Amino acid sequence: MGLEGLIRNLVDVFPGTVGLVINDMVGGRSLCINEAERLPAASLIKLPILWECFAQQADGRVSRETRISLTNSRKAGGSGILQFLEPGVFLTFQDLATLMITVSDNMATNLLIDSLGQDCINSAIRGLGLGNTILQRPMMDFDSARQGVENVTTAADIAQLLAHFVRSDTLPAAARAHMIRILAQQQLNDRLSADWPEAIAFAHKTGSLPGIEHDVGILYPETRPLIIVLLTRTDPFSRAGVRLCREVGQLLYQEML
C-alpha cells in the first residue's frame, strides 16, 4: 500500500474531522482530503497576519524602525511570554512577528492585529485568494468565542497561503525568505515533526484549541519543497489530533524522507 492509502486509512478511523493537503511543489502531485472543510483556525490565523506584517513593511505602510509598546490593555493569556513582562517594553514588528510564530505568542498577535488593522489583514487574505479564511476576533477573546465568533480556515486555503510563501510575485523574495526562516524556528514540535531528526528542515506553525489540533508547513527534503497541511477537530478532551499528526509525520518520514 502506498503513502496515500496509508494516510487515508488513518483518516478513516479518526474520531472526528480531518482536513489534509500534501502538495509537491515541483512534481505537482497532491493528496487532498476534506480540503474545503471549514474549521476553527486557532493559531493558524497567525500565518496571514505574518504575511500582512511583512507586506506592510515591504510597501512602506509601516516602518521597520517603529517600536510598539506593551500595554496591559492588550494582555492575552495562553501561549507566549509577553504577558509576563512589565508594561512599557518596546518591540519592533519583526520582534512581534517572531514571537507570534515561534512561541505562538497571543499578546504579540493582538498587538500586530491592532497595529496592522484587522480590515487590512482580511483584505490581504482575500487578495491571496483565501476565500474560506477570515480573522474575526483577537486571540483569547472568549466572550466573542462564546457568541460563535471564530477565526476560520480550510486546509486548501492554508496550502495556498504556504505556496505563496514559497513562490509569489506579490511580496519580495527576501521578505518571503525571512518569513520562512521565522517558521523554521518554530519551538512547538510535538506533531508532524515530533519523530523526525532535527536535521530535517520544516518551516511550520501549529494551532490548538479544545478539540482542535493543527500542524502545517513547508518541508524541505533534498530535492523539492512539500506543502503539508493537517487540520483536525475532535472531542475537546481528546489528544487524538496530536496523535494523528504524529502518525502522519511518521509515514511521511518513512515513505518520503
Tell me the role of every PLM-derived stretch:
Residues 28, 40-68, 100, 228:
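Active-site SXXK
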Residues 76-110:
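Conserved catalytic neighborhood of penicillin-recognizing serine enzymes
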Residues 32-39, 86, 147-148:
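A short glycine/serine-rich beta->alpha loop
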Residues 14-17, 111-162, 166:
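Mid-domain, small-residue-enriched loop/turn segments at the edges of structured enzyme/sensor domains
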Residues 59-85:
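Short, glycine/proline-biased beta-turn/loop segments that scaffold the active-site neighborhood
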Residues 15-38:
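Short, conserved catalytic-motif segment at the N-terminal edge
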Residues 1-9, 13, 30, 125, ...:
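Structured C-terminal helix/loop/strand segments within mature extracytoplasmic catalytic/sensor domains
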Residues 51-59, 114, 160-167, 253-254:
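Short glycine/serine- and small hydrophobic-enriched flexible loop segments
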